[in-house]
Amino acid sequence: GRQRHMFKRHRRERADTAKKSRGLFSPMKIIEAVEGALTLPFDEGMALERKLFLQCIDSPQRAGLIHAFFAEREVLKAPETKAAKPRALESAGIVGGGTMGAGIAVAMLDAGLPVTMIERDDTQLARGRANVEKVYDGLIAKGRMTPEAKAAVMARFSGSTSYDALANVDIVVEAVFEEMGVKKAVFAELDRVCKRGAVLATNTSYLDIDEIAESISRPQDVVGLHFFSPANIMKLLEIVVPAKVSADVVATGFELAKKLKKVPVRAGVCDGFIGNRILAVYRQAADHMMEDGASPYEIDAAVRNFGYPMGPFQVSDLAGGDIGWATRKRKAATRDPEARYVQVADRICERGWFGQKTQRGYYLYPEGARTGVPDPEVLAIIDAERVRAGIKPRAFTEEEIMRRYMAAMINEGANVVLQRIALRPLDVDVTFLYGYGFPRHRGGPMKYADTVGLPKVLADIREFAKEDPIFWKPSPLLVELVERGADFASLNQSE
């Protein structure tokens, strides 16, 4: 009876491990080795263990994990961190107490910094404080923090409706509404009150940081610090380097990342920096496949089976579809009229379905559920859009879905490296490992491209270009590497 109970529990743990490891096979090999220890004679058990060990050593997963390990250390090397020492970092200010501002405040408080939050009025300030406290209350509820520890942390938090409260802080992070006019108004106030030498950072995702910097009298102090939501949990911090910023300000960004236990990646100024710029492209590839015949649920499943925790349509529902909708409206005037534009997301947003927060998006979230269920009405919207666009739907296998999804990601990754938005391919890899849930055992999109082979990726892109030459334009860097017989790894040497 005891043995039967043991095996039952073992089966349960095996299933649990398989689910948690998301395609990483080494945890299952460990279980197999333990099974061997329980059921085989010693010599056979040792032989099995050796065989399993060699399977792990020879696998591309080992190479992916080792690449990830070294890449996350290599990203700390940037021209500015070599050229300059960071400025002092003893106190911080945050402008904006929404989800992002509060998350950044928690990250700063957890690092031991005193934090001053600025909001428009007392009501918004109270809401900002409540957003900060909610994080700690959640930890108390889980038994991971005591009320006394929370009180000690909150003693370092203060709020004000007057910018004058930021007169002496070493660094300010602006986390207000994503609109240029609003950002410039905030920076005009910071320019007026902050001490000389204070680092003035913006958390914008898409706006031109050079334009923000140019609008004040000290552009040399302005830097982008792009946190990922929830900012107190997500490890990635994109440090965005505008044209006029001084090297010690960039070095201070790296120093802040270290204090906050985050992984910094240096990025150049462009629409979306490294991560969101590439995301916009592979997300379009997903939309094209959806309109061509794959359901959003099939695409999400393929992406999860590749090793991601969530698929792109689940992510959209989690983040809120209204954000992407606003971005698309902002860009509508400058969109290439020849380029393909899938309207499914707009149809869904027009109905007020923004994802989890409205209980409907691509998925249905009954009674505020965290996990969505497929929605037949969404499939009907997609069908109607196919008819409108004159598209005859076809089936996609998981392999076909991932070939397109990854080719789009890799190709735009190559453009980002070519244009020096990312210093090296490994900076793209680290961005995706820490900000976008890319499976660690695959090393990152550029490492994955090397594993598959760049000639194969380029051949895929050229094949897809036959049906859509505007979307599928091979990156000149990818073409050049294939012609030279080189790979992305050859560009990872530090300068």
Please name every model-derived segment.
Residues 1-6:
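Positively charged, low-complexity/disordered segments
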